[in-house]
């Protein structure tokens, strides 16, 4: 059975060479963070526009290999999701751990093999599939299982395959 599903599409024009996916691509790359506004009743559109302009300028001047907007799970969620795709880990130090799981508007986490001035470098990607935040190490396989496990009942990825072919009239 298929659960009730809403499918929506957004269309825009963009140079496909500048479109980035969120997953980390290689070990040893620098991880950068542009903090956004904590989710609040009032939206600081000037900060959000400034962050987008800053990220666009960085992307124009430097090699950016992966990027993700910080969403409802905060910067730690963005980092965890970035490790899942290619099972590349990360070691980061966050100054404000109290708000690391707070939803944000207009924040970005991105990676680059280059040193980039004027933006907060929070860590590096790592070959081992772990996420280390301020010295606390989380196993990437356990994080990924916990993340995917909550969706397994709705969108199963494992099922018993029928061994007999049904007759088609």
Regions found by a protein language model. Give the residues of each.
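Carbohydrate-binding surface patches
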Residues: 109-111
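Intein/HINT protein-splicing elements and their conserved insertion hotspots or analogous self-processing inserts
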Residues: 1-102, 113-169
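A structural-propensity feature for long, helix-poor, extended segments
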Residues: 104-106
């Amino acid at each position: 059975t298929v659960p009730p599903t809403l499918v929506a599409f957004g269309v825009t024009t963009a140079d496909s060479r500048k479109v980035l996916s969120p997953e980390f691509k290689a070990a040893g790359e620098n991880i950068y963070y542009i903090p956004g506004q904590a989710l609040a009743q009032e939206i600081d559109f000037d900060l959000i526009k400034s962050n987008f302009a800053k990220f666009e300028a960085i992307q124009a001047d430097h090699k950016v290999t992966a990027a993700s907007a910080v969403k409802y799970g905060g910067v730690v969620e963005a980092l965890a999701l970035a490790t899942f795709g290619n099972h590349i880990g990360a070691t980061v130090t966050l100054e404000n751990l109290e708000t690391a799981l707070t939803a944000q508007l207009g924040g970005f986490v991105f990676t680059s093999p280059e040193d980039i001035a004027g933006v907060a470098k929070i860590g590096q990607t790592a070959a081992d599939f772990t996420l280390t935040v301020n010295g606390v190490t989380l196993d990437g396989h356990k994080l990924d299982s916990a993340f995917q496990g909550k969706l397994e009942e709705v969108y199963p990825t494992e099922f018993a395959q029928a061994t007999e072919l049904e007759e088609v009239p």
